[in-house]
Amino acid sequence: MISIRNLCVELGDFTLKNASLEVSDGEYMVVVGPSGAGKTVLLESIAGLYPLRQGEIWLRGKEATQLRPEYRQVTIVYQDHALFPHLSVRENIVFGLRMRKTDPNQTRAALERVVDLFGISSLLHRRPATLSGGERQKVALARALCVSPDVLLLDEPLSSLDPQTREDIQEELQRLHRMLRVTTLHVTHNFEEAVALGERIAVIGEGEVKQVGPPEEIFRRPNSEFVARFAMSRNIFPGVLCRPEAGNCRF
């Protein structure tokens, strides 16, 4: 579904270096790493928001490297929700369909579908400023799914929420994925969140994809000290190499 091949993006002093990643159709993958690692740059590159220095992006078996964002069938939900403050919830949700000049009957049907999905019919006439953090997140997700995207990109969707709301939205994301099986790439700095949601995890740091695998593999068999420390492994100990010997080393 998503194939990223040797992606390089330069933004000022930051470079996303030779990033390669494969996300299967219907998979929920979480990209995890510290702040400034390149997680959001990776998402926005897939969405077509940055020019690439090198590399290719393939979506649904077709090269999308040069496609404009509006032709990629990809939607992105940001940490701050990016809702239009002057529009009602209803107008926010159908904004993408109206920009595409979708038939009014189809727009109405799509609106009803996502409103029922999230249980937000009582919010339709309200403005974003009057909503709670959890309600804004549901509206942002409803807007993203209203256009029936092939790929859903989530940029730190839980990080600005209080603990109870974070747990509720996490359960909502799991429920939605079970129902819809939309290919999803979710970025976070929280390893526990990545383990809870990801069918596979990609660890990224310093602009590089360090390791990709199921959560248990990342935790039990990290391929570097960076991954081990980020996965909160407790079996890292300081040591001094005393003398290398044939077939082994003495510490």
Q: What kind of region is each of these model predictions?
A:
Residues Q73, H86-F226:
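ABC ATPase nucleotide-binding domains
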Residues A47:
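Helix-to-loop junction immediately C-terminal to a conserved catalytic motif
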Residues G55-E63:
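Conserved ABC transporter NBD signature motif
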Residues T40-L43, V139:
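ABC ATPase nucleotide-binding domain helices that frame the ATP-binding cleft
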Residues N223-F251:
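ATPase nucleotide-binding modules
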Residues V32-P34:
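The feature captures the beta-strand-to-loop junction immediately N-terminal to the Walker
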Residues R53-E56, E206:
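Conserved coupling/switch loops of ABC nucleotide-binding domains, chiefly the family-specific signature
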Residues I4-L7, F14-S24, G55:
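Conserved beta-strand
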